[in-house]
């Protein structure tokens, strides 16, 4: 599991870190970005508002609050943008990873903005010119995301691609809700079994470098 903070990203994208990515690729080990010390929270200057700080999610003192929740995806976006722009995913086409417990509703627009940026700057940016895929295609190939159960994963799939998302309950933490499976099933209404199987099983297998059995075999 890697820190996705800006300082860490400056290290991971440098070519002298390539032996690490080569090791992960050769040994079929996925990298993981997870909420934690490297996660961006609301800058402290915004908390200087003259109000008493609210209790955290679990009723204690040092955990997640609403303003921090709204910043969860900033660090993964910065990290993945650096990995794309600095050519890590291009140099290591079999590298895989996951973004865990940072939500996923932001992913479709993030992919659009990556490609929008490419169209806007590729005529003058030699690094964009050298890419052998569109920026969003590197993400689709390499990275998987876990939506929160209260997010509309069906909408995300329609708005991007079914291979991007995978089931996660975060059990036993309360943000997984009492019935994550039921919530995801309601969101996936109308999708065929192949797409559901990708969400519940084969997208995880891909991320973990595992070979997926056919759906019929897996059900036996």
Question: Across the structure, where does each feature detected by a protein language model lie?
Answer:
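Mid-to-C-terminal alpha-helical segments outside catalytic/metal-binding sites
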Residues: 86-87, 95, 106, 124, ...
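Short, well-ordered coil/turn segments that N-cap beta-strands
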Residues: 27-29, 93-96, 135-143, 163-165
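Active-site beta-loop-alpha junctions enriched in small/polar residues
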Residues: 9, 29, 34-38, 102-105, ...
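C-terminal active-site-proximal or functional interface alpha/beta core segments in diverse enzymes
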Residues: 57, 70, 74-78, 108
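Charged helix-capping and loop-helix junction motifs
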Residues: 13-19
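Single conserved hydrophobic/aromatic residue that forms the stacking wall/gate
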Residues: 1-8, 12
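Active-site gating loops and adjacent loop-to-helix segments of metal-dependent hydrolytic enzymes
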Residues: 39-71, 117-139
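Alpha-helical scaffolding segments of alpha/beta enzyme cores, especially the outer helices
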Residues: 19-26, 87, 186
